[in-house]
UniProtKB/Swiss-Prot annotation:
Keywords: Amino-acid biosynthesis, Cytoplasm, Histidine biosynthesis, Hydrolase, Magnesium, Metal-binding, Zinc
Protein name, entry field: Phosphoribosyl-AMP cyclohydrolase
Taxonomic lineage of the native organism: Bacteria, Pseudomonadati, Pseudomonadota, Betaproteobacteria, Burkholderiales
GO molecular function: magnesium ion binding; phosphoribosyl-AMP cyclohydrolase activity; zinc ion binding
Its biological purpose: Catalyzes the hydrolysis of the adenine ring of phosphoribosyl-AMP.
Enzyme Commission code(s) on record: 3.5.4.19
PANTHER family: HISTIDINE BIOSYNTHESIS BIFUNCTIONAL PROTEIN (PTHR42945), HISTIDINE BIOSYNTHESIS BIFUNCTIONAL PROTEIN HIS7 (PTHR42945:SF1)
GO biological processes: L-histidine biosynthetic process
Length: 134
């Protein structure tokens, strides 16, 4: 007997059983991070209202904030037009989404002309990662 929710049938997972998941601040619209979800992570996120991802490096569920305390409360889940990307509109507890101690993982901007361009860090570290991940 299949206990998977009916809405899950519309979600298109890749050949590894994963789907990219974009976390966006529900109030400001700022993109915080991109991670991956499998069926179990998506189902748990929908059931609990807390962001759960699949860690490809650790090969296990990653409950955002389980080590750092920077959990994500999910206000809304959206599925893109092709069904192959999830958008989570979240409240980022502690204001830090990135393991580098920044608000967003997108803290570098490409500046300069194409042949002379370089990535420039534009967002500050809000908290030393050494203090976050003790």
């Amino acid at each position: 007997m299949n206990t998977e929710p009916t809405w899950m049938a519309e979600v298109v997972f890749d050949e590894n059983g994963l789907i990219p998941a974009i976390a966006q601040d529900a109030e400001t619209g700022q993109i915080l991070m991109v991670a991956w979800m499998n069926r179990e992570a998506l189902a748990e996120t929908a059931a609990t209202g807390r962001a759960v991802y699949w860690s490809r490096s650790r090969q296990r569920l990653w409950r955002k904030g389980e080590e750092s305390g920077h959990a994500q409360d999910v206000h809304e889940l959206r599925l893109d037009c092709d069904g192959d990307v999830i958008l989570l509109k979240v409240h980022q507890n502690g204001g830090i989404a990135c393991h580098t101690g920044r608000a967003s993982c997108f803290y570098r901007r490409l500046e300069g002309t194409a042949s002379q361009a370089e990535w420039i860090t534009i967002d500050p570290v809000l908290k030393d990662p050494e203090l976050i991940y003790k």
